Amino acid sequence: LKTLNETNQVYIIDIRAAADFTLGHIKNAHNVLLKDILTHIAGVDLTNYTKVAVVCYTGQTAGYATSLLRLMGYQKAFALKWGMSSWNAVFATSWNNAIAAGNAYSTQFVATPTEKAVAGKLPVLSTGFTSGQDILEARVAELLTAGFDPAKVTSAAVFAGLSNYYIVNYWPAAQYTDPGHIPGAIQYTPKESVKLAVDLKTLPTDKPIAVYCYTGQTSAALVAYLRLLGYDAKSVLFGTNGMIYDIMVGKSMTTFKEAEIMGYEYE
């Protein structure tokens, strides 16, 4: 991102609160509210930019927003991995706090598999529209207006009520077994399982779905897609970095660490 920015090849949208943006941001970044991101990008000539970078605090809200932008056809949209936490240590508080408490559930993961539910029906959408494009636009607008809050859940809330959620482990099958998973979680293979022709319809339409990955960034992007379709899906914040951090480090899985913080200048 730094290199692209120095050569004017990237358009940066920072969706953090205005007060935090004022305290420090990447040079050339535009501060835009999440609910306004689609309206904003529609008014920008992106011809000369190779990428659009969406920036938040941790990479999670940006993952959610980027997923919706891509569903709307903006294939140049990318989320800044780890958010501003990766840019400079000044902005890394959220991630540092998450991993500081990141071993809270290290003794509670299990290897026992839970089978997927039997395939059922897709959610019913009521937008008042009939064409695919109109329905898509209405759903994306609704999700952006609602913001990221309804689309996220803490690991503490999930562990406090395991039976309240259909828990999706969005990992490769081998890792579902080792290092294991949240009790009752069901393995869905990234980029494959949630396709309509594969296992999408095994997801429930009458129960909240808690999706977790390593960091909360991929799950946020997936949850945007699932919520668009009408599922009550929620991304588990900080993923397993906030649950079994040391175990992940030991197995060389994706973790936030000091080496991820670049120490770049900001304005």
Regions of interest found by a model, annotated:
Residues 1-26, 31:
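An N-terminus-focused feature that recognizes amino-terminal "leader" regions
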Residues 1-4, 144-160:
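A short, well-structured juxtamembrane/interface segment
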Residues 22-51, 63-151, 174-208, 217-267:
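Rhodanese-like catalytic fold shared by cysteine-dependent sulfurtransferases
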Residues 55, 212:
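Short, surface-exposed ligand- or partner-binding patches at beta-edge/loop junctions that are enriched
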Residues 11-16, 29-32, 165-169, 185-188:
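Short hydrophobic beta-strand that contains or immediately precedes a catalytic carboxylate
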Residues 3-7, 45-48, 158-164, 202-205:
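Flexible, charged surface loops at secondary-structure boundaries
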Residues 17, 172-175:
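Single-residue recognition of alpha-helix capping/boundary positions
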Residues 59:
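Aromatic/histidine-rich interaction motifs
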